[in-house]
C-alpha cells in the first residue's frame, strides 16, 4: 500500500489557527483553498470537511490527488500566492495542539463549505 502512495490520493488534516482579529479572513481562505487547488488539478473531487475547535482553530480534511500533486503544489505560483495569504492571517499548527485532539471522541462545530 505504501509503495503506491506517490500516485494514490492522500487525505490531509490541517489545523489553521487564526491570528487575532483574522477569523473571518482565515475562514474565507480555507473555504477557497480546495477550489483553488482543484483549478490547478492538484486535489480530488472529494468534498472537504471543515470544522471549528473550541479555541477557534479551523480544521480541514481534504484529499490531494497524490504525493506528486503535493510536490507540484510547492512549485506552483498560484498555490504559493494562496499560501502566502494564509501566512498573513493564520498559523498552521500540529493537530495535537488542538485541545480536542486529546479526547477519545473529539467533537467539533461543523462549518458549511
Describe every region a protein language model picked out.
Residues 5, 32-46, 63-100:
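An amphipathic, aromatic/His-enriched active-site/gating alpha helix that lines ligand/cofactor pockets
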Residues 5, 98-113:
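Acidic/histidine-enriched, glycine/proline-rich intrinsically disordered or flexible terminal extensions
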Residues 5-9, 53-55:
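Short coil/turn motifs at beta-sheet boundaries
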Residues 17-28:
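Short, surface-exposed ligand-recognition loops at beta-strand->loop->(often short) alpha-helix junctions
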Residues 49-55, 89:
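A short beta-turn/loop motif at secondary-structure boundaries
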Amino acid at each position: 500500500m505504501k509503495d503506491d502512495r506517490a500516485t494514490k490520493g492522500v487525505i490531509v488534516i490541517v489545523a489553521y489557527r487564526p491570528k487575532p482579529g483574522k477569523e473571518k479572513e482565515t475562514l474565507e481562505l480555507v473555504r477557497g483553498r480546495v477550489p483553488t487547488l482543484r483549478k490547478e488539478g492538484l486535489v480530488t473531487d472529494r468534498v472537504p470537511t471543515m470544522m471549528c475547535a473550541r479555541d477557534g482553530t479551523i480544521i480541514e480534511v481534504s484529499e490531494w490527488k497524490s504525493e506528486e500533486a503535493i510536490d507540484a503544489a510547492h512549485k506552483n505560483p498560484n498555490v504559493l500566492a494562496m499560501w502566502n495569504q494564509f501566512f498573513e492571517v493564520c498559523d498552521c499548527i500540529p493537530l495535537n495542539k488542538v485541545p480536542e485532539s486529546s479526547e477519545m471522541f473529539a467533537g467539533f462545530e461543523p462549518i458549511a463549505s
